[in-house]
């Protein structure tokens, strides 16, 4: 009697059930990517322009986030934010109900803060890779520093950073499986892998 290595009927039957969790996975990844792009851009600018206090805070933020595992950050978000909000309620007399906050919000916070730290380094490296003479040339023809940055430097930096953003998005899709630890059932959680 010959045994079958893979049960293809079971795989086909299960595929539809697993795909039902795909919107949650994509939702986490896309929302995280959008907000991370925005936050990481400002973190990168703060570090490049060496704004006194803000630059130091951005450096500490990037170092801390990149030095701790995402799983720890999810737990800190999931257990820490409610504690902070309860403390703020008691301290300032607010009436915020922490129990009404959906769990996915804590996942978004952890993922956005994590991805922003990594993507800020991508932004920073991409901006610094554009030669300074291009900024100087733009300023010499009458552009302000912000105009030169917006019209000359950032478009080139974005092209340089785009492959890294793609890699970050792929990694983010994989990382969404960690949301299962706080009971968000996404693609891998649904598959029980």
Describe the residue ranges of each PLM region.
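Transmembrane alpha-helices and adjacent helix-loop boundaries
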Residues: 1-193
């Amino acid at each position: 009697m010959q045994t079958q290595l893979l049960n293809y009927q079971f795989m086909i039957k299960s595929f539809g059930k697993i795909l039902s969790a795909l919107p949650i996975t994509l939702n986490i990844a896309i929302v995280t990517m959008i907000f991370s792009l925005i936050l990481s851009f400002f973190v990168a600018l703060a570090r490049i322009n060496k704004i006194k206090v803000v630059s130091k805070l951005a450096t500490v933020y990037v170092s801390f986030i990149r030095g701790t595992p995402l799983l720890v950050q999810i737990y800190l978000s999931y257990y820490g934010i409610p504690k902070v909000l309860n403390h703020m309620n008691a301290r300032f007399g607010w009436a915020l109900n922490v129990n009404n906050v959906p769990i996915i919000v804590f996942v978004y916070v952890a993922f956005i803060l994590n991805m922003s730290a990594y993507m800020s380094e991508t932004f920073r490296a991409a901006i610094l890779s554009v030669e300074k003479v291009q900024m100087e040339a733009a300023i010499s023809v009458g552009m302000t520093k912000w105009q030169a940055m917006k019209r000359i430097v950032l478009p080139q930096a974005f092209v340089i950073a785009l492959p890294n953003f793609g890699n970050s998005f792929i990694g983010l899709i994989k990382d969404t499986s960690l949301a299962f630890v706080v009971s968000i059932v996404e693609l891998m959680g649904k598959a029980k892998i």
